[in-house]
Amino acid sequence: MAIPVINAVINFSTGPSFAQAMILDTGVLDTNVLADSTAIIVDVSNRVNRIETNRGRTALSDQFQTGALTLRIVDQNGDFNPQNVSGPYYELLTPMKKVQITATYGSVTYPIFSGFITNYVTTYPDESGEDLAITTIQAVDAFRLAQLAQISTVTGATAGDLSGTRVNQILDTISWPLSMRDVDAGLTTMQADPGTNRTALAALSTVASSEYGSLYVDATGSFVFQDRSVTAGSIGGTPTVFADNATGIDYFDASWILNDVLIFNKATITRSGGTAQVASNQDSIDKYFLHSYFLDNLLMQTDAVALDYAQAYVASRAETSIRVDSIVLDLYTDNYNSGIIAALDLDFFDPIKVITTQPGGSTLEKTLQIFGVRMNISPNSWKTTFTTLEPVIDAFILNDTIYGTLDYNVLSY
């Protein structure tokens, strides 16, 4: 049975880039990055004891969160113990060094996590009850760096900038590499930057919210900004089908849920310097009671756009239905080639359809989007969990059998 090969690499160079340094007359153009010396990069793949990654968006905060990694490596010689003064990397074992996890399967290498080390903890057999000395490395993705960076003035951030332009201006302010960005142009024009003291992450999140788009860090370590047209339209792609009745990729477990977490039937959206714009759905309020949503100090230029936001939000959230909360894939399942590829390749906003057979023979079927990816990997186990949610914003999608129904789907702004 073929299983993906884990690659775990610690990069002791400075700066945000995960690439090897470019050395004149030696380096490879379009592969290495320009630097003054070779980065010390250590492959710890053959020492891996366990890997846990968690990236995604939470339903309650309605935003993507900082991704996290726990990497446990066998460390019998204390090479990665920062207290070992005779260790080969002693002076290099400091916080914010880079770590990257990938998986190779069928000659394709898939990114799993790229981030920055926050701490090292070494435990010994007599302390942990294990037979081996283990160093546990914990890391976070680039959201943490943006959260740590305080900014005020954003150069060039004038009224009329599209949201994507503003995102790039903020990333320029913290000197984030151009090669580590995937930024859509955006549809909403911004006010001039307020110039207040805040974190870069707060500034980026305000722009993303003003656009009604999405901001996250992908598995390669790049900042990704999607405008609302991409966010809304991505559900219209061809879904990967997971089913327990042989009509799709088999899965280990699927958790179905029906609750009120995603219901919002009144939204109050206020732009900076504007008046509160309110939208509500009385039928939903009568049915579910009042579920309110507030967002203020946004940067769209007009109250009309703020009202569009409020109306689109309520139209997308006034109703709910049974949905798949999460689906688990076991990569050690026999004859699981398609499942392994899906587990490694699918990521945020990818549409999936889940089919579950109920007692009595009826089926539950739902098409949703992936908004969270969690992996738990050990020498004899590999499970990938996708958390799923309804689209961030509903939109009418032409020729789509689910999101292209007149009198049912929403015309977005």
List each model region and its residues.
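An acidic/polar, Gly/Ser/Thr-rich interaction patch typically located in mid-to-C-terminal regions
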Residues: 62-85, 183-230, 234-237, 241-413
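Glycine-centered loop/turn motifs
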Residues: 94-98, 160, 347-351, 355
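Short acidic/His/Gly/Ser-rich catalytic and metal-binding motifs that mark active-site loops
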Residues: 145-149, 178-183
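Short secondary-structure junctions
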Residues: 174-178, 361
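Assembly/oligomerization scaffold segments
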Residues: 1-159, 169, 191-212, 217-219, ...
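Short, charged, amphipathic alpha-helices and their helix-cap/turn boundaries
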Residues: 162-175
